[in-house]
């Protein structure tokens, strides 16, 4: 007997092959063998139906799980879409904040630039005020400050201890003549002193003006300063990597006359000057403080 593939309830009985009974086995009747085969088939069919039912239950569970996974996936996709929208909104807000910050930064830079200009203007005004105060105090340290009284042209009228002074110097007779008949011109302001030296007669065409800045020596070591209402000139030279003062001149104005005390090579010479009208040659040319001559010992 065999099971039809189109129906699980209809059976067809086919004759079984006759087998020879084995030794020791009792022979069975055909009716009993047919009943046993039908019972086995029914049990197998029942088992298949149970398995089919289990498979159907499993399929239903898988379908249910699939639906739940689909819902979860849709929820995840929805959340991702919402996150994308939030990120887009956040990016737009960030761009707006960046634009606002950039605008504020430009405004701050403009304010800083304006403040810097105001600061420079204020500093300039303050420096100008302090310079004015300093200049006024510079000229008001004494009742007759040397900075004002020495300005003008002076001519030698008296000289003391000149022979001893001349003997101690390495100068020519020509320079000695200049020292005896020298005219000096001074013009002092806050930071500098202008000087001019010339012979009253033969040196007028070669008169020369020099500019010296207070407390700054020139290339020849000539340094002007004001000490105790006196105009001081010191000349230094380097010897064995050390600076040595080789000449010092103190000038002061007393009773309308300029008194000069000049010390050089350990010997002192004193000269007295009187103020005279300006007789400098108009052809005289200004010179830098770095153009002095090495023989300029009579300043």
Swiss-Prot record:
Organism: Caenorhabditis elegans
InterPro entries according to UniProt: Calycin, Fatty_acid-bd
Annotated region (Disordered), positions in chain: 1-38
GO MF term set: lipid binding
Family, as annotated: Belongs to the calycin superfamily. Fatty-acid binding protein (FABP) family.
Lineage, highest ranks first: Eukaryota, Metazoa, Ecdysozoa, Nematoda, Chromadorea
Protein name as catalogued: Uncharacterized protein EEED8.2
Superkingdom as given in the UniProt entry: Eukaryota
